[in-house]
A protein has these predicted regions:
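Alpha/beta-hydrolase active-site loop
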Residues: 45-68
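Active-site signature of alpha/beta-hydrolase-fold catalytic machinery across serine-
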Residues: 91-95
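Accessory cap/linker subdomain of secreted extracellular hydrolases
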Residues: 115-202
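Gly/Ser-rich "nucleophile elbow"/oxyanion-hole loop immediately N-terminal to the catalytic nucleophile
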Residues: 60-82, 99-100, 104
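A conserved short beta-strand
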Residues: 101-114
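Short, surface-exposed "cap/lid" segments of acyl-processing enzymes
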Residues: 1-25
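Gly/Ala-rich beta-loop-alpha elbow adjacent to hydrolase catalytic centers
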Residues: 81-89
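Short beta-to-alpha linker loops that shape the active-site pocket of alpha/beta-hydrolase fold enzymes
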Residues: 32-36
Length: 202
């Protein structure tokens, strides 16, 4: 999700998943991640810890709401997500398994089509000369991780070449969609990277 309004709290198109699950008897909790919806600041895209805490906070709020509304829950927890949601699903599963097993009875987890190995196979895919179907992914991760880890780089120009070092940042203020980013990106995302970055992967 790139646009801060394209989230469950704004009844985005993905809410159909919540409606479907609710219609089949599940209580569905679809979180907005940090930096999206009403949450201030940049969105830490594919940042496992913040995705997991947002999801767990939403699960706790949902459980409390159900108690207030006298909705009985059976205690089973099912997790799923697609793309970034798949990454968030796996991060949430990991946090529950490692830290919150006594609070949540994790019954099943189905992460789908997510970038799970961000610093491994996903990073390698980004530095190849091959086209990538969602070029916006690379700059989104770079801006996001620069926000989460401020020592990563002092200026985006250290990582991204011109003209993209100038043209991309305004598109990551929460008001644009991935299509607008892809429109100015090369088919092979690695073309925007500084040679020094590419050399560090060789």
């Amino acid at each position: 999700i790139l646009n801060r309004d394209d989230v469950p709290s704004r009844l985005s198109g993905e809410m159909i998943v919540g409606y479907f699950l609710g219609g089949t008897g599940y209580v569905a909790a679809l979180p907005d991640y940090l930096g999206l919806g009403d949450s201030p600041g940049p969105h830490p895209y594919v940042h496992a810890a913040s995705e997991a805490t947002a999801s767990i906070d939403m699960m706790r709020a949902t459980r409390e709401f159900c108690a207030q509304q006298s909705v009985l829950l059976n205690g089973q927890v099912f997790l799923t997500g697609y793309s970034q949601g798949g990454h968030a699903c796996m991060a949430t599963h990991k946090m529950i398994q490692e830290q919150l097993g006594e609070e949540f009875n994790l019954t099943a987890s189905a992460p789908c089509s997510g970038p799970y190995d961000v610093s491994g196979s996903q990073a390698q895919a980004m530095v190849t000369p091959d086209p990538y179907p969602a070029p916006y992914y690379l700059p989104y991760v770079l801006f996001s991780y620069g926000y989460v880890y401020p020592d990563l780089y002092a200026d985006i120009g250290e990582v991204i070449q011109e003209p993209w070092a100038t043209s991309l940042p305004p598109l990551f203020q929460g008001n644009n969609g991935s299509g607008e980013v892809d429109a100015i990106m090369p088919a092979a995302p690695s073309e925007i990277l500084q040679d020094s970055v590419l050399q560090s992967f060789s």
